[in-house]
A protein has these predicted regions:
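Alpha-helical transmembrane segments of multi-pass inner-membrane proteins
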Residues: 143-169, 181-244
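A membrane-periplasm/extracellular boundary helix in multi-pass inner-membrane enzymes
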Residues: 218-222, 243-324
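N-terminal signal-anchor transmembrane segment
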Residues: 1-74, 98-105, 225
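Hydrophobic transmembrane alpha-helices and their immediate junctions
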Residues: 147, 205, 249, 370, ...
Length: 469
């Protein structure tokens, strides 16, 4: 069985890391072996243990996870948690499913394996929504689930510290217990697990909790992530000041002082964010934000995204008239999203491939050179700039992207706390439209937000009952 190894990273270190992650997973499974939902969530957080043994084992893992989700759904009788007002979730899931299979069957070339692997994650999300709702609202397991997620977050921190001790440098691809290829989760994990910590501690952090938060930032640092250094401090500020509705008292001042410290440490610890391009370089505000703008919008910047459309041209050669395809050029992740909204608003002509996509192989089985030649109206400067929104456009088209947005965002309208609702939607919007879209594509990330959602709803319901008495 071929192992999935990164040949630019020391192989003995990768094997040592794999053993360490596997041991951590087994330990967590043993601690929570009596609860099927806990076992499911732990396994969903440890895909790299199985992906390490090749694509075949990875596909087996995905099948097992779907079956285990179905088993827990039946075993926990999660269907009883359904309420008529949640019919929108099922309706939009049905709409998304019809568009997904219509595109996969008639407009794109996909293998059954890749269709299953992509669609199963959305099925798991729907099942997990009702499983977690039943566990928290009807079975009273909210505190237990928060404790479990807290421990899983601690496991990610320990694994990241061990990784840095083994390699003595940032390794982007090996991200905690989740990823072997691609480190984008190094941005998402700190954000989601901060929300878990905030809810678990009721917004009251001790010194150890702030240390835990620094550990989450280290998860991103060890994977060489830059975005988390900007986004996490903003998320921390929003939760303590806006979501919590706290007046600016003594505790809030401590929080306000800690947020800039997070940003300061992030800039100095991340080589690409300081002029010296080294760990613990100098703090240069202009340099850091200049890099961030170029990262999001390319060298053209935000203003350069407005006049970048190649019009059709005719070429006469050998008695034959040929036409160059029109291309809407886009630089960076922000540029990709701007270009997509131009297409959706009808500012530029579209082709059939724009509306129905080119299939999952075109996104996930192409190298950078092949990606540049895809017959789409939008031409991205390079594949690494593809946001979650743009990936939906490539694979299932503009129609599929619209259905994805409607389905995946509909969950958050059931959050009763208005401030928390808009904050969660804002985080998901940034992550899908301006980053990689890993929240919607990773069932356990959706599960984390479902725990936050249902636990918060339960707390609000309990407060209302107490007030009525």
């Amino acid at each position: 069985m071929p192992l999935e190894l990164l040949y630019n990273v020391p192989i003995p270190g990768q094997i040592l890391m794999q053993v360490f992650v596997a041991v951590a997973m087994v330990y967590m499974l043993y601690r929570h072996r009596r609860d099927a939902l806990s076992v499911l969530l732990i396994l969903l957080c440890c895909p790299r243990v199985f992906l390490f043994f090749g694509s075949t084992m990875g596909n087996v893992y995905k099948v097992v996870m779907l079956l285990l989700c179905g088993y827990v759904f039946v075993q926990q009788r999660a269907a009883v948690a359904y309420q008529r007002k949640e019919g929108w979730i099922l309706l939009l899931f049905a709409l998304f499913s019809m568009e997904f299979f219509w595109t996969a069957a008639y407009y794109t070339q996909n293998t059954l394996t890749i269709i299953f692997s992509q669609y199963s994650r959305y099925v798991e999300a729907v099942l997990l929504y009702f499983i977690i709702k039943k566990a928290i609202v009807m079975d009273g397991k909210g505190d237990r689930l928060l404790r479990l997620l807290y421990e899983i977050g601690l496991m990610q921190i320990i694994i990241s510290v061990f990784k840095f001790a083994v390699f003595r440098e940032q390794v982007e691809s090996l991200c905690a217990s989740f990823s072997i290829y691609g480190g984008d989760m190094g941005t998402t994990i700190p954000i989601l697990w901060f929300i878990v910590l905030w809810l678990y501690r009721k917004g009251q952090f001790s010194k150890l909790d702030w240390l835990y938060l620094l550990g989450l930032l280290f998860v991103g640092f060890s994977s060489g992530k830059r975005a988390v250094m900007f986004i996490l401090p903003i998320v921390v500020f929003v939760f303590f000041v806006y979501v919590q509705g706290r007046k600016v008292g003594k505790y809030a001042l401590y929080v306000l002082a800690f947020v800039p410290l997070l940003f300061y440490l992030g800039v100095r610890l991340t080589p690409t964010l300081n002029p010296e391009n080294q760990v613990w370089g100098s703090f240069d505000w202009d340099y850091a934000f200049g890099y961030a703008e170029e990262y999001q919008f390319g060298k053209k910047g935000i203003d350069g995204q407005t006049a970048n459309f190649k019009t059709e041209q005719l070429q006469y050669s050998g008695g034959v008239i040929s036409t160059y395809n029109s291309k809407l050029e886009a630089d960076g992740r922000g540029g990709a999203t701007i270009a997509m909204f131009k297409l959706l608003l009808g500012m530029h002509p579209t082709a059939d491939s724009d509306w129905w996509g080119l299939g999952f192989n075109s996104m996930y089985s192409t190298d950078y050179a092949e990606f540049d030649k895809l017959p789409l109206t939008i031409q991205l400067n390079h594949k690494g700039s593809a946001t979650g929104f743009f990936q939906s456009y490539v694979t299932i088209g503009l129609a599929g992207a619209i259905c994805t947005v409607l389905f995946c965002f509909c969950f958050w309208f059931y959050i009763k706390n208005r401030r928390l609702r808009w904050t969660i939607m804002g985080i998901c919007a940034w992550e899908y439209f301006m980053y990689t879209g890993s929240i919607f594509r990773t069932p356990v990330f959706m599960a984390v937000l479902f725990v936050v959602m249902h636990y918060s709803n339960m707390e609000m319901q309990q407060k209302r009952r107490a007030q009525q008495r």
